[in-house]
Amino acid sequence: MRLACALIAALASPAAASEPVPIAVIDYDYLDTSGEPTDQQAQHVARLAEFMRSLRADLGAEGALRVVEIACAAPPCTAGGTPPAVLIARAKQAGARLMLYGQIHKMSTLIEWANSEIVDLEADKLLDSKLFTFRGDTDEAWRRTLAALRQHLGT
């Protein structure tokens, strides 16, 4: 069963089964510990922005989930840059039932990983944790990773 459908089935009450489940998608953190001499920060910022834009669009596209925006006082509005209690409070204020957050970590010239977590905010419970490893630091490598995350989430 696709993860998104399984999550929604687990969360939905019979009365609200037809309503999309609101999810706050927190910007992912990015960490580069590769030690490469070339400054690639601009490329990484652009890739991460596109990754997040596409992820949010895909999650809301089928109608089972409704992506909600949270208000952040100052960037970065990420799990690494904002205390968890603040993110959770803001997600709840925005009406979210679920919260998705994660990190992309460039470990070496060729190896990166993407970690994604989904939390049920009402039950205060981690529903899903997935680690994807990927090879390469190119637009195509990031697109493949996003495709793998989409498949995992069922979007």
Regions found by a protein language model. Give the residues of each.
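Short beta-strand->alpha-helix linker/helix-N-cap micro-motif
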Residues: P20-L31, G35, D39-Q40, F51-P83
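Extracytoplasmic/secreted envelope proteins and their assembly/folding machinery
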Residues: L48, M52-R56, I88, W142-L146, ...
